[in-house]
Amino acid sequence: MRAVLLHGTKDVRVDDVPMPRIVEDGDAIIQLAAACVCGSDLWPYRGIDPISSPVSAGHEYCGVVQEVGASVTNVKPGDFVVGSFFASDNTCDICRSGYQSSCLDRRPMGAENCQAEHVRVPLADGTLVATPSTPDPDLIPSLLACSDVLGTG
């Protein structure tokens, strides 16, 4: 599949990378409908955060669930979902207090590459929120703001 990778300062490429797969029972694979560029994605692009090997870009996303791990119960294949920039379990005391980005088991989604055709989402039950139906294509870009807000509480 294709994915955006940062190879160095002002060096952005669309590369072929392996398709993500279910690694843990709580994972989901999402076919991305939209993703955005965050200011923190621009730090390595501008050379402020130097990189020595290609790194993934993007961590705010929405799309359609393609596959779920054995323990996932909150979303199913075919659901349109919005995901947080941090994967979180949404069960620990910190999450239950509304601070999912500080979850005891949090995982940054930037490492998963949300600027791609598909993405693996760990802790899917705590990270993904399904919409009641597939949104109108004109609404999808607006849902990206939710991706940032979901993790900040």
Identify what each model region corresponds to.
Residues P20-C36, I48-D93, E112, P132-P135:
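Glycine-rich beta-strand-centered segment in the early N-terminal region that forms part
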Residues D89-G153:
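NAD(P)H dinucleotide-binding glycine-rich loop of Rossmann-like/cofactor-binding domains
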